[in-house]
A protein has these predicted regions:
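Phosphate/nucleotide-binding beta-alpha loop and adjacent structural elements of enzyme active sites
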Residues: 1-177
Length: 177
């Protein structure tokens, strides 16, 4: 409900609908940690730095993206953007069928395990490769204040044999002149 005001505001400008739930690999209910001072850091997972950083907990329903796509009769192809503070693979595990009709996935990927139970960089890359996706581009990075090390990046994944990888040349002959 914390975000519902913003969702309603968006729907005044654009047509669509929303579902107040956490995307996950299973349908059910989970504990969700709300960070009142930085809502974008709210997560299903606990912070590695301790309970003071976890904020307060609420119960939220969970849905599978596959069920949402089926129930809403959404038309393919899909572009999926997931930024859920370390629970990205759980979201994608609930979208196994939808992934087959998806050409582009944008994921926030951490280079450190900031959240308990979060996958590391390699696990995300391997999961995506196992599901037929490869890295296409790496977008903005976020550096951790602790030591200025690269902490997170947004990675664009595309189908390995999809429309964005039909041509493997570096450049055309004209571009190299």
């Amino acid at each position: 409900k914390s975000y519902e005001f913003f969702l309603k505001k968006i729907l005044k400008k654009y047509s669509g609908s929303y579902c107040l739930a956490a995307a996950s690999k299973d349908k059910g209910e989970v504990s969700f940690n709300i960070h009142p001072k930085h809502m974008e850091g709210s997560s299903l997972l606990k912070e590695e730095i301790g309970v003071k950083a976890d904020g307060f907990e609420i119960k939220v329903p969970t849905i599978k993206i596959d069920d949402l796509v089926n129930d809403k009769k959404l038309k393919k192809p899909f572009l999926i953007k997931v930024d859920v503070q370390g629970a990205e693979l759980d979201v994608l595990r609930g979208a196994e069928i939808t992934l087959q009709a998806t050409e582009v996935i944008v994921l926030e990927v951490s280079l450190f395990k900031f959240m308990k139970g979060a996958p590391d960089f390699y696990e995300v890359i391997k999961f995506m490769k196992d599901h037929g996706f490869v890295t296409y581009d790496i977008l903005r990075g976020c550096y951790r204040p602790l030591d200025k090390a690269l902490g997170q990046v947004d990675i664009i994944f595309v189908k390995e044999y999809g429309i964005f990888r039909k041509d493997h040349r570096f450049a055309t002959p004209n571009q190299l002149k």
